[in-house]
Amino acid sequence: MNAKNNDSIVISVCTGTGGVATGGYKVIDAFKEELAKINSTAKIGPRTHKVGCRGFCAKDVLVDVDINGEIETYQHVTADKAREIVASHILGKEPVKKWLVKEDYHNFHDKQQKLVLADCGKINPESIDEYLAIGGYNSLKKSLSMEPEEIIDIIKKAGLRGRGGGGFPAGIKWESCRNAKGNPKYVLCNADEGDPGAFMDRSIVEGDPHLMLEGMIIGAFAIGSPEGYVYIRAEYPLAVDRLCLALDQARERGFLGENIFGSDFSFDIKIVLGAGAFVCGESTALMTSIEDKPGEPRPKYVHTTDKGLWGKPSNLNNVETWANVPMIIEKGADWYASIGTEKSKGTKIFSLVGKINNTGLVEVPMGITLREIIYDIGGGIPRKKEFKAVQTGGPSGGCLPASFLDKPVDYETLYEAGSMMGSGGMVVLDEDSCMVDVSRYFLDFCKDEGCGQCTPCREGVAHMVRILTQITEGKGSLAHIDLLEELAQMIQDTSLCALGTSAPNPVLSTLMYFRDEYKAHVVDKKCPAGVCRNLTTFVIDEDLCTGCTLCARNCPAGAIYGEKKEVHFIEQDKCTKCRVCYDSCKFEAVKKG
């Protein structure tokens, strides 16, 4: 990169999936077109390139303009804005202040500690030269001068735990696979994150694919594997394209293939496209899918490190776990272990979504509190609504109330609270979120995504969904609550795989912390959040209504009437409980009951 040349101009445009979806490629074309005009009359050497996701996806398209090392960041850039930025900022030396990022952008990043995402948004993910320029593949070269057992000891001492689910110590898993009988051994990467609203692994592959590949190659050398697989969902076309390009570049430079770095170590990686099945995130289901069989979990009487892919010892980690490896080799186990908590080392990437002002990816040290993530980084709840809960760990995670806001985020704390770290999904819920409906939604997802092999999961989860649906429709009873708990315990105790055993978590956690909300549904026949239509009535507060007519104009059912600047009323017979009036009223005059 030429960022520090005295006559250099470098324009970096976000082209992660979020950036592309909001016009990133059009922005690049506009910059190139305008800069080409400049080059015809001035020798200033401008350069425009793609970068990966910077995390604050709500601000896309994000653009850095670097003139002689002085960087200004713009948000919500369009092709038209790009042309004005060139005219004003690059030619006129005057940044377009109205489009620069605001304080919330800096607040979003200030409390983060970016290690895995350190170079996402800085380097071109399609250029291996830019990865090499920041020290890429140096850790691999260093590893090849070490003994495999030494590398495993470093990973164990660092305390790296799997970032894809249960948090099993990576070094112990590597050691088990290396010591297992049978060859060849396989190294696998799960890039198939199936949690709704999760995009951590996708962003790493899109923004810094060589980091993950370098980690896999180091792991393969330590384990003694000649062949690896990346299992990635076909619905990630941009990530797949950049991963394929990165693999080709790595082979061309000798980082993959025969005799890597002139050593006697040979290793290559193949890509397998997943069809988007959530159950294929389970390790044995993923492996059967790679074997070109239906993605169904197998009983784990024998660990996959002993008998995994094609019956051979196999080591599976997700993208984020592999991406941590190069920095541990480079900076040492003690450095890595100094970050985080006693039992949860390093950082964790979370997909922060839901009822939150600042939506995006955040990378924070283990042990940070939920309050810091949600309020300091996430900017709190929109419209000054009250925080109700945060759902962590994906569809089979748990919902934690406000009393947990000051608890540390680590594997043990979340597990003890009835939730889990999972792959890093974090959904924020506010006062307008119905916890019964949230439970029904996530359980319904697990029902649809189950493989159908075992009766407890197949029939038990489906029956729980039916009960929750009855409760949200006003047909529930107190006996249903007891039955939900009984079914949940049975499913946890007897299901075949982790998808089944963890599926009831949203229900159990909401029953633990929001039991009164369930009782309101079955006893009072009311939904306190105003979400369940059969249990909700909307009325207009005469003292707060200004007669602005906004609710009446937006009502799709024509159920609201009243003269301008006079109190309005809702005809209950016509009201469909769609919440449009409630959400659109600027004076909070529409009340739910």
Protein language model annotation of sequence segments:
Residues 98-157, 311, 317-332:
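Flexible inter-domain linker/hinge segments
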Residues 18-20, 136, 155-177, 276-288, ...:
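Conserved phosphate/anionic-ligand binding catalytic regions in large, soluble enzymes, centered on
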Residues 344-358, 370, 528-576, 580:
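C-terminal accessory/binding modules appended to enzymatic or scaffolding proteins
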Residues 1-10, 24-49, 66-92, 138-157, ...:
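Ferredoxin-type iron-sulfur electron-transfer modules in oxidoreductases and energy-metabolism complexes
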Residues 240-366, 378:
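Hydrophobic alpha-helical positions that pack around
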Residues 123-125, 131-138, 187-201, 304-309, ...:
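Gly-rich Lys/Arg/Thr-decorated short loops/hinges at beta-loop-alpha junctions or inter-strand turns
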Residues 59-65, 456-462, 540, 550-569, ...:
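Iron-sulfur cluster-binding cysteine motifs and their immediate structural context
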Residues 215-217, 367-382:
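Short amphipathic, charge-patterned alpha-helical segments
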